[in-house]
C-alpha cells in the first residue's frame, strides 16, 4: 500500500479511484481528516482502495492525548481500517521529549493510543557507518509490540538525503531482513517518489520528481522479490 498525503478530500477521492484501478491501497491523509473527521471518514470508509488513515509522523508525548481522542473518533466510525502514527527512533533526544528513555516513550504511546499497529522509522546507514543503537531500537520496539499484542512495521531508507547515502542492494537487504528478523509484519520504504526539499537535499529516490525510475527502483524491486 502507499502512504499518501494530499491537499484536499477531493484529491484523495481521485487518488483512491486511480489506486483501485491499479490494485494499490492507500493510507490517506488530507487536512479535512483533522478538521472534518466524521464526514471525511464516512466518505472514504467503504472505498475498496482504502488501507487506513495517516494521522501523524514522529509525535512527542505531549501529542499523545490529542492523538488518542482523534484515533478513538475515527475508530468509532470505522473500526475496519487502521490509524497510522509513525514513532520516533531512539536517537531522538529523550530528555527534550520529557521521557526517561526510549522504552518509556514507546510504552506511553501504547498505553494511551489504541492503534492496531505500531510503526517507527530508523535509518541506520549514515555515510559509510551504521548507527550503533539500531538493533537496540528494534529489540525494544519488537518487545513492547509483542507484550501489547500488536503488530509492528519498520522502514528501510530508499531516498538519499543529508548524510544518508544512495542505498546499495546490500544496505536495503540489511535493513529489511533485520526488520523481519525482529518480527516486523509490515515493511516500509522512505520514500517511493523523491520529495522536493531544498532543506534535506532529497535525491535518487526510486522514482524521480518527474516520474522516472532510478537504479534504486531496480534495487528495491530485487529486494522485494527476494523477500
Q: How should each PLM-predicted stretch be described?
A:
Residues 1-227:
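Glycan-processing catalytic domains of CAZymes
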Amino acid at each position: 500500500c502507499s502512504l499518501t498525503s494530499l491537499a484536499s478530500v477531493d484529491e484523495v477521492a481521485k487518488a483512491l479511484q486511480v489506486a483501485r484501478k491499479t490494485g494499490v491501497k492507500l493510507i490517506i491523509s488530507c487536512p479535512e481528516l483533522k478538521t472534518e473527521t466524521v464526514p471525511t471518514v464516512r466518505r472514504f470508509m467503504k472505498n475498496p482502495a482504502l488501507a487506513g488513515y495517516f494521522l501523524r509522523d514522529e509525535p512527542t508525548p505531549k501529542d499523545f492525548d490529542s492523538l488518542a481522542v482523534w484515533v478513538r473518533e475515527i475508530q468509532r466510525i470505522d473500526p475496519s481500517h487502521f490509524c497510522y502514527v509513525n514513532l520516533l527512533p531512539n536517537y531522538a533526544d529523550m530528555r527534550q521529549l520529557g521521557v526517561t528513555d526510549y522504552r518509556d516513550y514507546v510504552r506511553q504511546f501504547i498505553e494511551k493510543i489504541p492503534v492496531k499497529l505500531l510503526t517507527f522509522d530508523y535509518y541506520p546507514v549514515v555515510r559509510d557507518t551504521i548507527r550503533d543503537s539500531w538493533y537496540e531500537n528494534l529489540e525494544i520496539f519488537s518487545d513492547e509490540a509483542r507484550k501489547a499484542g500488536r503488530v509492528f512495521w519498520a522502514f528501510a531508507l530508499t531516498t538519499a538525503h543529508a548524510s544518508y547515502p544512495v542505498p546499495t542492494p546490500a544496505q536495503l537487504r540489511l535493513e529489511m531482513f533485520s526488520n523481519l528478523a525482529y518480527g516486523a509484519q509490515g515493511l516500509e520504504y522512505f520514500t517511493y517518489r523523491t520529495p522536493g526539499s531544498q532543506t534535506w537535499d532529497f535525491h535518487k529516490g526510486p522514482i524521480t520528481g518527474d516520474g522516472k525510475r532510478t537504479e534504486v527502483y531496480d534495487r528495491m524491486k530485487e529486494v522485494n522479490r527476494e523477500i
